[in-house]
């Protein structure tokens, strides 16, 4: 039986600590804290969890963590707020350039997209 937490099916054959990282907003350290609080051993595979353990984990995540859709929308709203107030970071987001001070002379292709080739100017003939 697949265990579903906040709309994400956890992989059955992985350790609990790793499986919880499939949820957006939960990393290794958060998953370790959640499992410790729920009283579940980190090394137990997901398929070996009892229904009570899964329910306890769901309860902890629901009460203490902002994950999946809520977190994604909060991040989007934060970026939109930066763009609306017109600060440097917001402007960089708006024009699609790196936000954190990286150089853009040669690289930054991930943020800028594919290279746009510009034709050379033809030399004047005598």
Swiss-Prot record:
Basic residues bias (residue ranges): 108-126
UniProt-listed InterPro entries: Rbsml_uS13_C (IPR027437), Ribosomal_uS13 (IPR001892), Ribosomal_uS13-like_H2TH (IPR010979), Ribosomal_uS13_bac-type (IPR019980), Ribosomal_uS13_CS (IPR018269)
UniProt GO MF annotations: rRNA binding; structural constituent of ribosome; tRNA binding
Membrane-spanning ranges: none
Pfam families the record matches: Ribosomal_S13
Gene Ontology terms: cellular component: cytosol; small ribosomal subunit
Gene3D superfamilies: 1.10.8.50, 30s ribosomal protein s13, domain 2
Keywords associated with the record: Ribonucleoprotein, Ribosomal protein, RNA-binding, rRNA-binding, tRNA-binding
GO biological process annotation, one example: translation
Superkingdom, natural source: Bacteria
Region described as Disordered: spans on this chain: 98-126
Cited SUPFAM superfamilies: S13-like H2TH domain (SSF46946)
Function field: Located at the top of the head of the 30S subunit, it contacts several helices of the 16S rRNA. In the 70S ribosome it contacts the 23S rRNA (bridge B1a) and protein L5 of the 50S subunit (bridge B1b), connecting the 2 subunits; these bridges are implicated in subunit movement. Contacts the tRNAs in the A and P-sites.
UniProt family annotation: Belongs to the universal ribosomal protein uS13 family.
Complexes and interactors: Part of the 30S ribosomal subunit. Forms a loose heterodimer with protein S19. Forms two bridges to the 50S subunit in the 70S ribosome.
NCBIfam families attached to this UniProt entry: uS13_bact
HAMAP family: Ribosomal_uS13
Protein name in the entry: Small ribosomal subunit protein uS13
